[in-house]
Amino acid sequence: MTQPSPTRPPLNIVIACGGTGGHLFPGIAVAQELKKRGHKVTLLISQKKVDAQASKNYGDLDFRVIEAIAMPKIPSLGLLGFGLRLYKAIRFSRNLLDEVSADAVIGMGGFTSFPPVYAAHRKGIRTYVHD
């Protein structure tokens, strides 16, 4: 992405990057570079301990927590709970995208990425996936 200019305003970018350090830290690196270029960045992380601890070290970044949901491995009644949690995560993502007036969503991989990337796609917002 290019630097903002008088003809190109800063973008509002959401990065879904939580769940594991392998998804989180690349997302943080991308966020830092985008901020340097003048864009507004919101990072979506899971409620996992690794995300909470790491986010404390980056006070200049805007972190939001989204429920981390993984699909049950075998067909069971757990699918009902999964479906409800997935619906709530997508609804949360849609509301957040509206709140921050998102221009683009970057999914860094992992189960935390699906709800915001899906919500952005459904809203016609540009989506990017890195894994």
Language model: regions and residue ranges:
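A donor-sugar binding/catalytic signature common to diverse glycosyltransferases
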Residues: 48, 104-108
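Short beta->alpha connector loops at strand-helix junctions that form conserved
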Residues: 65-69, 108, 129-131
